[in-house]
Every structure is written in C-alpha cells, then in structure tokens.
C-alpha cells in the first residue's frame, strides 16, 4: 500500500480506485516469480484477464484471443500446455510478461525483468516492449541494474543515489562517467555504442579502487 504521496494517472488518484479498477490501469511484472506451479502456462497468462471478467469470472472469445496474442508475442505458444513448475527461470519470467500483456493496461511496471533471461530473450523481451510503446502508446517503467540495457532501450532514465532520485534525463545525459562514478563509488568508462551511439558503461578494471584485498574478504 502507498505510504506517502500520491500517484496520478490521467488525472485520477490511483489510491482512490478499487483494486479491480486500478488493475485496468497498470500491470506489474515482479522480480519474484509468484506463479502457481501446477497451473499451465495458458492458465497463468489467462489470470491477466481477471480485472475484466466480472463477478462470475467467465472468459470469452476476446479474452482468449488476447491471451493467445500475448503467448505469441513472448514466444510461449509452444509451451502453452506445460505446467509452470516444469519451466526454467527464464521461461517463467516470460510467462509473467505474457500475463501482464494479457492484462492490457496503458502502464506496465517491471522489476528487473531480464535477470533470468539469456541474451537472445533479453533482446526479444526489450524489443517487444519498445514496439508496444509505439504500437499501443504503452508507458513502460523498468527497474534495471544493467546500465547498458538501460542506455540502449530507455527513452528517459532516473539514476538513484541513496534511495532517492539523483538525476533524470536522456541516457546520454545521465549515464556519464562522472555521474556513475559518483553514484556507484567506483571509476567507470563510458563509450558510445559502435552502431547506435548509446552509452556503454565499462568498469575501470585497472583502478586500484577495484582491487580486492585479504582485508576486504575478512570484513
């Protein structure tokens, strides 16, 4: 629950909405994979339609069409009848995204969504989100520790320092060597991506501040 402040979407205070109404505004892809292991992939993604089912909980053709589209977008169609408990961590992460897409909201919140994905599925995942921001005018907010992915895919970034927003702006303006060295307390180099020109963050591996001593291991 909200502890302080207010969150407004299109002039509406989200805290004043019933949870079902709020679920039609924003969907969440959590870091923890909280999926029923005995459910099939299809059943798990169908849960995203809950805010639209009414008191009887009956699904219709539209609901199943949206679920099938979400499965296709996340490359899960071939796994639709598999039990979630049989999937790898990366596959379960894609199920969470498919469930959120099936919720069909204008806002999508994601917490470290690429943690359990290999390089191919990271690219598929983030490219899909980029496409949806254009095709559906979707607003996507992502928490990422991978600064290179943030620099490559984000339109705007917010850099945190000690739990508060330190800087916001375009990746090239925020993800600079000076800013990152201060926030992370370690020297870094930032170079342009060879094809896209976006910032690539490289730790300064030869810096003495990066050396691990026996005293560090004892502390």
Model-derived segments and their meaning:
Residues 46, 61-79, 104:
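Conserved ABC ATPase "signature" region
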Residues 83-87, 91:
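Conserved ABC ATPase signature
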Residues 108-112:
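Catalytic Walker B motif of ABC-type/P-loop ATPase nucleotide-binding domains
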Residues 183-219:
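ABC ATPase nucleotide-binding domains
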Residues 157-170:
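H-loop (His-switch) and adjacent beta-strand-loop-beta switch element
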Residues 5-13, 22:
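Conserved ABC transporter NBD signature motif
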Residues 123-136:
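Helical segment within the ABC ATPase nucleotide-binding domain
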